Amino acid sequence: MVAINSNGFVTTTVEELLRWGRRNSLWPVTIGLACCAIEMMHTAASRFDLDRLGVIFRASPRQADVLIVAGTVVNKVAPMLKLIWDQMPDPKWCISMGGCASAGGPFPTYSTLQGVDRIIPVDVYIPGCPPTPQGLIYGILQLQRKIKEQGITKYDKLFADFNREIEKEGIFVPRELKV
């Protein structure tokens, strides 16, 4: 809840401030495995410009909070994909881009993973073969909406404790400084 008081100051909660920051500065790491990766690169270029949405691609999973899997995932790549997912700090989200990443695509074989959601949790599915840049942008907007609505669930207890402390004391004072 954001409110503006009579002096023109904006007041909000720490939780809402962090939600706003998280959803407006998504840093994805990409797993580009097929033709979907070409469309993803096209989306990041000047015509569609993902930077205007706060999306800045990262080279390291340790600096990213979104994993975009674009293309066919074969069984030999699956352990590496899981490792990349595990290296990402929490909170983290996953976008499955295209029919191949979402359900195996036209490759129902023993060597193809029939959906990324079999090894990591997926937050947004983007259909298409390959999806258009507009589809990827729509998927990112859906992820931003999801972050706004759900918040950062892992830290909900921390926010609840913090907000209770503020309400109890009237102002936040670190526990070790209380007299």
Curated annotation (Swiss-Prot):
> Which residues are listed for [4Fe-4S] cluster binding in this entry?
35-36, 100, 129
Query: Where does this protein reside within or beyond the cell?
Result: Cell inner membrane
Its primary localisation, in coarse terms, equals membrane
Q: Which UniProt keywords apply?
A: 4Fe-4S, Cell inner membrane, Cell membrane, Iron, Iron-sulfur, Membrane, Metal-binding, NAD, Quinone, Translocase, Transport, Ubiquinone
Q: Name one GO molecular function term.
A: iron ion binding
Q: Which cofactors must be present for this protein to function?
A: [4Fe-4S] cluster
Which enzyme class?
A: translocase
The subunit field of the Swiss-Prot or TrEMBL record says: NDH-1 is composed of 14 different subunits. Subunits NuoB, C, D, E, F, and G constitute the peripheral sector of the complex.
The record's comment on protein family reads: Belongs to the complex I 20 kDa subunit family.
Could you identify this protein by its name? NADH-quinone oxidoreductase subunit B
